[in-house]
Amino acid sequence: MFYFDKKDDRVLFCDNRQLKTILCDGRDYEINPDVLADFTALPFEDDTFSLVVFDPPHLLHNTESEITGWQQIKYGALTGDWKSELRKGFAECFRVLKPDGVLIFKWNETNIKVSEILKLTPVKPLVGHKSGKRSNTHWICFIKN
C-alpha cells in the first residue's frame, strides 16, 4: 500500500476485503487491512483524521459478485452505481477529516476520466499531479474548509 512502515501506528489502513493469493506472475499478494471497512460507511467519528488517502477502485469491468482477473484482485472493482458509490466515498472522507484536514485522492483513468470523478465531490481540488507510463494516474489534493 502507500505507507513505508506497516508497523507505524500513525497509519491506519482500511479496505473492504482481506485476502491472500498468488498473482498470475507467481507473486504472493496479500491484503491485510487494520480495519475492514467499506469506504462509503467508514466506522470513525466525525473530524477524526488530519490526513486521509482515498484510493478507490477504478475498474468497472466486474459484474460478478466475486472479483476475478489479476487487476481486479489487486485493485478491486467498482460495482453498481459507481457515481453514487464514489460520491458517498468522498462524503465519508470529508466527514472523518478534521477541519483544515488534507485529502489525497488517487485515480487512474483506465475507464473513467478524472474530470467525471471531480464532479462527484463538493470540494474543489487544490493541487494535482499526473504520473504513470501514460500519465493516466492522478494524485489530487483537497483541503477541508
Give the positions of each predicted feature.
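Class I S-adenosyl-L-methionine-dependent methyltransferase catalytic core
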Residues: 1-145
